[in-house]
Amino acid sequence: MKKEKEQLINCWLKSGIVKNKRIIAAFRSVKREYFVLSEFRKEAYSDTALPILAGQTISQPTTVVGMLEALELKPGMNILEIGAGSGYNAALMGRIVGKKGKVFATEIIPGLVSFARQNLDKAGIENVKVINTDGSIGYVSGSPYDRIIVTAASPEIPEELVQQLKEGGIIVIPVGSEIGQTLIKAKKTKGKLVRQQLGEYVFVPLKGRYGY
């Protein structure tokens, strides 16, 4: 698996998809095979999304690192993730923000909450908290956040998330219909979001009050 992992890294570096060296270090450090179902472990480093539980998926590695690059993560940051899934993305962010940082990862599906927590424990990630809640309304208890990442498709950017984002903070979120979305990177400037489009994607739909 190490060979396949390094092939992905070389591809990202050559294409310029990833420039933040901390993302590469985190990808090397965190074992994706811990976050997939046992029957898919041999495919852990194929550049594809894989099924997990409850009809959900773990995103393809290139999509994951592209979103992390857009977040402009730094050590010590306070992060909110909407849609913990298997916990893999949260694990990478936990490594990047380091011991002085914190990741709050919300997940609305109870079975996935248990799955993510088990996987994070297995990987030795201690600065990620997985919460069973409706992430479409955010998580006030951990706010305000330096960065917010939404890993499911949303009809729009929920105002609650904007309110929980620090001034100067960044949110990355796929926005659109259930069958196709535009990945948005938005920076909070003077209380409002300044948006940038990062391309077209297809994510699983967001569940909850502001989901589908």
Feature locations, PLM:
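Class I SAM-dependent transferase core
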Residues: 1-84, 88-96, 112-129, 189-212
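Conserved nucleotide-cofactor-binding alpha/beta core module
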Residues: 72-194
